[in-house]
A protein has these predicted regions:
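Long, contiguous binding/interaction regions
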Residues: 1-200
Length: 200
């Protein structure tokens, strides 16, 4: 029988080695909501603005609950945990209603950037989206956010301007080979307010 809600995907666990020790990568769990306050406290205002495309300092408790309680049929998030068990970063994908595309996001603790954690989180997200049958990943990035554009560009994403919003670019990664007939980008998601953190 078909389960209405997928069970926790234990098979999606990875470990990455860094000079300071091993970081665990795994799907997010509801209990990870307890790790969010300390995590967000160590994300700078500028990194918060670049992530949410708007200045936001305080997140109510319900945001952490929403971010950690997922319907795995539609959404997936991966966390990276430091050797001490602290939250180091989160990557996330939300599938479009047709499940052909997914909108991704990434946030890494400011003091831990530059160590390959963001790249590792994006790679496992790409691996998951491909295995889940999505055709492409898409994400809006501020035009000034060269670091994020460089990261996803290195992973194979194309970067295209958004004609009616010069402050933002669209990054797209096709997950199927061209001979598989991958559809064109930009068709899966309705336009949403780029200041709404719940949609990113």
């Amino acid at each position: 029988p078909h389960l209405a809600i997928r069970p926790y995907p234990t098979e999606w666990r990875r470990t990455i080695e860094r000079p300071e020790g091993a970081y665990e990568l795994r799907p997010i769990r509801p209990a990870d909501a307890l790790l969010y306050p300390a995590f967000l406290d160590r994300v700078s205002r500028e990194d918060m603005r670049l992530r949410f495309l708007a200045v936001r300092v305080h997140f109510p408790e319900e945001f952490a609950l929403r971010w950690t309680q997922l319907d795995y049929d539609r959404e997936m998030a991966f966390v990276a945990l430091t050797p001490e068990g602290e939250l180091a970063g989160v990557s996330r994908v939300v599938a479009a209603p047709d499940h052909l595309s997914g909108e991704y996001s990434l946030l890494v603790r400011s003091d831990l950037q530059g160590r390959g954690i963001g790249a590792a989180l994006m790679r496992i997200l790409i691996e998951y989206a491909r295995a889940d049958g999505m055709d492409r990943l898409e994400g809006m990035v501020l035009a000034e956010n060269r670091a994020m554009q460089g990261l996803v560009g290195h992973l194979g994403f194309t970067i295209e301007p958004i004609l009616d919003d010069p402050g933002v670019v669209m990054s797209t990664l096709f997950l199927r080979r061209p001979e598989d007939g991958a559809p064109k980008a930009g068709t899966g998601f309705p336009q949403v307010s780029r200041a709404d953190p719940g949609s990113r």
